[in-house]
């Protein structure tokens, strides 16, 4: 029984020693998460950018009933311009996604660790009560 009680503080100190590498792994996880987030946002935004020129074409098509030849070449360059501007909008938005996602993940991890520690404490107290009785 004495050996078990001595082994419990060792595991408790191991939890504290493991808390620092977990914060390092969190930053690594945030970096990988942000990269995957960038890729997913590229795909979703490229779809929206392809839809937005199509919506611009519909009104111009309605107005171009008088002259199809003059406005058909004019409608093709604006979608290219929109794509370039959308790409320029990507760069300022990416750091905000990076910056916002990491603290949320850290808070969630801290909460999970606290719950695990509390569950272990409750189990230890329960075991000691049952042993003493």
From Swiss-Prot:
<keyword id="KW-0744">Spermatogenesis</keyword>
<keyword id="KW-0539">Nucleus</keyword>
<feature type="compositionally biased region" description="Basic residues">
    <location>
        <begin position="79"/>
        <end position="93"/>
    </location>
</feature>
<dbReference type="GO" id="GO:0003677">
    <property type="term" value="F:DNA binding"/>
</dbReference>
<dbReference type="GO" id="GO:0007283">
    <property type="term" value="P:spermatogenesis"/>
</dbReference>
<dbReference type="GO" id="GO:0010954">
    <property type="term" value="P:positive regulation of protein processing"/>
</dbReference>
<keyword id="KW-0238">DNA-binding</keyword>
<dbReference type="GO" id="GO:0005730">
    <property type="term" value="C:nucleolus"/>
</dbReference>
<feature type="binding site">
    <location>
        <position position="12"/>
    </location>
    <ligand>
        <name>Zn(2+)</name>
    </ligand>
</feature>
<dbReference type="GO" id="GO:0000786">
    <property type="term" value="C:nucleosome"/>
</dbReference>
<dbReference type="GO" id="GO:0035092">
    <property type="term" value="P:sperm DNA condensation"/>
</dbReference>
<feature type="binding site">
    <location>
        <position position="16"/>
    </location>
    <ligand>
        <name>Zn(2+)</name>
    </ligand>
</feature>
<keyword id="KW-0544">Nucleosome core</keyword>
<feature type="binding site">
    <location>
        <position position="30"/>
    </location>
    <ligand>
        <name>Zn(2+)</name>
    </ligand>
</feature>
<keyword id="KW-0479">Metal-binding</keyword>
<feature type="compositionally biased region" description="Low complexity">
    <location>
        <begin position="46"/>
        <end position="72"/>
    </location>
</feature>
<dbReference type="InterPro" id="IPR000678">
    <property type="entry name" value="TP2"/>
</dbReference>
<dbReference type="GO" id="GO:0008270">
    <property type="term" value="F:zinc ion binding"/>
</dbReference>
<feature type="modified residue" description="Phosphoserine">
    <location>
        <position position="133"/>
    </location>
</feature>
<dbReference type="Pfam" id="PF01254">
    <property type="entry name" value="TP2"/>
</dbReference>
<feature type="short sequence motif" description="Nuclear localization signal">
    <location>
        <begin position="111"/>
        <end position="119"/>
    </location>
</feature>
<protein>
    <recommendedName>
        <fullName>Nuclear transition protein 2</fullName>
    </recommendedName>
</protein>
<feature type="binding site">
    <location>
        <position position="26"/>
    </location>
    <ligand>
        <name>Zn(2+)</name>
    </ligand>
</feature>
<keyword id="KW-0597">Phosphoprotein</keyword>
<keyword id="KW-0862">Zinc</keyword>
<comment type="function">
    <text>Plays a key role in the replacement of histones to protamine in the elongating spermatids of mammals. In condensing spermatids, loaded onto the nucleosomes, where it promotes the recruitment and processing of protamines, which are responsible for histone eviction.</text>
</comment>
<comment type="similarity">
    <text>Belongs to the nuclear transition protein 2 family.</text>
</comment>
<dbReference type="GO" id="GO:0007340">
    <property type="term" value="P:acrosome reaction"/>
</dbReference>
<feature type="region of interest" description="Disordered">
    <location>
        <begin position="1"/>
        <end position="133"/>
    </location>
</feature>
<keyword id="KW-0217">Developmental protein</keyword>
<keyword id="KW-0221">Differentiation</keyword>
<dbReference type="GO" id="GO:0007341">
    <property type="term" value="P:penetration of zona pellucida"/>
</dbReference>
<keyword id="KW-0158">Chromosome</keyword>
<feature type="compositionally biased region" description="Polar residues">
    <location>
        <begin position="1"/>
        <end position="33"/>
    </location>
</feature>
């Amino acid at each position: 029984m004495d050996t078990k009680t001595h082994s419990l503080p060792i595991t408790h100190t191991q939890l504290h020693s493991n808390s620092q590498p977990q914060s390092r792994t969190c930053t690594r996880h945030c970096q990988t998460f942000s990269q995957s987030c960038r890729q997913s946002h590229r795909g979703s935004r490229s779809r929206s950018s392809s839809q937005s020129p199509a919506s611009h074409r519909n009104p111009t098509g309605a107005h171009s009933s008088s002259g199809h030849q003059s406005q058909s070449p004019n409608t093709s360059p604006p979608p290219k311009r929109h794509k370039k501007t959308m790409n320029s909008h990507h760069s300022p938005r990416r750091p905000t996604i990076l910056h916002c996602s990491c603290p949320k993940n850290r808070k969630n991890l801290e909460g999970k660790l606290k719950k695990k520690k509390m569950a272990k404490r409750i189990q230890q107290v329960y075991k000691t009560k049952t042993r003493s009785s």
